[in-house]
């Protein structure tokens, strides 16, 4: 499994951002090997962390080739003040007690 951590400082979102963001999310969900995502908002700032879960690197790379995703990456300065992407291969994931809707999609 692979995780993509997308850390961002939001800027100004307009209607075009929301339309493109929805299209990118739909493309992710339609990509074979997409396992889900989790979103956290930092209480002391406007910073957001979104973690995407992928079954394999091939699945992630397939999504990375999506035209809407590429367009969003090129236009990040229009909507974000800052961003950081970290891609990690998961060696092991375990835990208990958060419930089915928040446990890592294994």
Please report, for each region that a protein language model flagged, where it lies by residue.
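Short S/T/G/P-rich N-terminal loop/turn motif that feeds into the first structured element of a domain
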Residues: 1-48, 57-65, 81-106
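A common structural junction motif
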Residues: 70-74
């Amino acid at each position: 499994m692979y995780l993509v951590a997308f850390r961002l400082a939001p800027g100004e979102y307009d209607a075009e951002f929301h339309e493109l963001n929805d299209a990118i999310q739909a493309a992710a969900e339609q990509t074979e090997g997409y396992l889900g995502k989790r979103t956290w908002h930092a209480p002391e700032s406007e910073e957001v962390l979104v973690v995407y879960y992928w079954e394999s690197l091939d699945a992630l790379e397939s999504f990375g080739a999506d035209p809407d995703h590429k367009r969003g990456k090129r236009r990040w300065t229009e909507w974000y003040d800052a961003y950081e992407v970290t891609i990690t291969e998961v060696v092991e994931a375990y835990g208990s007690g958060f419930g089915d809707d928040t446990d890592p999609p294994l």
